[in-house]
Amino acid sequence: MTTDTLQTRRPPAPVPPQGALGPIALYRALRANAITAWRAEAYEDAYIIGRNRLGGFVLLNDPDLIRHVLIDNAANYPKDNLQLEKLTPAVGRGLLTAEEESWRLQRRTVAPLFQPAGVTSYLAAMAISVDEMLARWDRETGATVDVAREMTRLTYDIISRTVFSNEIETPPDVMGEAITTYFGALGRIDLWDVLPLPRWLPRPAFIRAKPAQKIFRDEVLRLFERRRARIAAGESVPDDLVTRLINARDPETGAPLSDAVVHDNLVTFIGAGHETTANALTWTLFLLSEFREADARVAAEATDAPDADALARLTDTRMILEEALRLYPPVPFMSREARSRDMIGEVAVAAGTRIIIAPWVLHRHRKLWPDADMFVPERFAPENRGRIPRFAYLPFGAGPRICVGMTFAMQEALLALTMIARRFRLTLAEGADVMPFARMTLRPMHGLPMRVEARSSG
């Protein structure tokens, strides 16, 4: 893969506006596609200070300043109330939304389940899900499929198989649509986000999303209660994530998680977990279709039934996946709220200030990444990784609240990519308009129509 080739091809991204947007233009940009709202200076400055009708905010782009918020003084920067307001009705108070002692108890109890040894035990189940998708593609060779939808279906099937041993009764399409509907509706900026309206006033988005929320929360609750009853009765049960979570104990106290916490975390894993990995796979497959040199390298490494050792040898595939996560981070924004006054470097922060860390902006920052908008997987070669500042690359967050499922997601993505590349090559459909689109996660705005071709035929 030559530098000349890479520098003549800029993967699609919105062009930042020049200068600050006025209040109405900013609201429209945030509502239409949030990544279009950041002006060009955001990709060059260490921080941006701003205000809206709900108060002040600071966008951080300097790795040292980000470290201060996520590590050094993390206790002063919990997740902001607006984020919790949107997520809690769906995922309850699991790891994604819990705070303080509740979060610490959950984290130390759940984290051991996602250590490499635990994740490795799921690889065979993951491979079955990928094989079933590829068998369907065998019957559709030459056809055009929406790869974004295919990856969402795949990662949902993997979560269903590894978490619930495929015992979910609600049809996959119904569950998947419910999850997408909920997070899509609440990920859209509305007047409640920019005006000081009473918090008790019902949000139309919440009302629209409630039926979808009920579908997946009720289904998970049924499965959890059924499994808990079987365990209590001494029956043999699958060794999946439901069973492991019910049996997990706090390493400090020996106490189990409460039923409500187990339920909320299961909803979190199936709701938030599968969509982020689906987006990572979608964007990586798109980049492979655009950069055939990269596609050839992934195919050269590909293996049909990868185990943990085989995945560890996928050096080029991992580099390409990590570069895809840089260009198209599945979660484009994260935010915190200052509990009390603080200094972040030279920036004085008042209590209540919203701190925004935007991987979409950070990963394309001109001072941190040479050729920031270009696809250059060699950035992540073993000999180059040490040059990347630790807090310049945050596809899974960082600090105490780094994504607990990071290892699971990376192994899942590597396994899917190598199995797909061994058997198929994907080509973007003629005339397809590909543009990233941000709600809570980053997806292609119009899906990703691609033609499925058997690898041996090309």
Tell me what each language-model feature is.
Residues 2-105, 120, 124-135, 154, ...:
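N-terminal membrane-proximal hinge/A-helix region immediately C-terminal to the signal-anchor transmembrane segment
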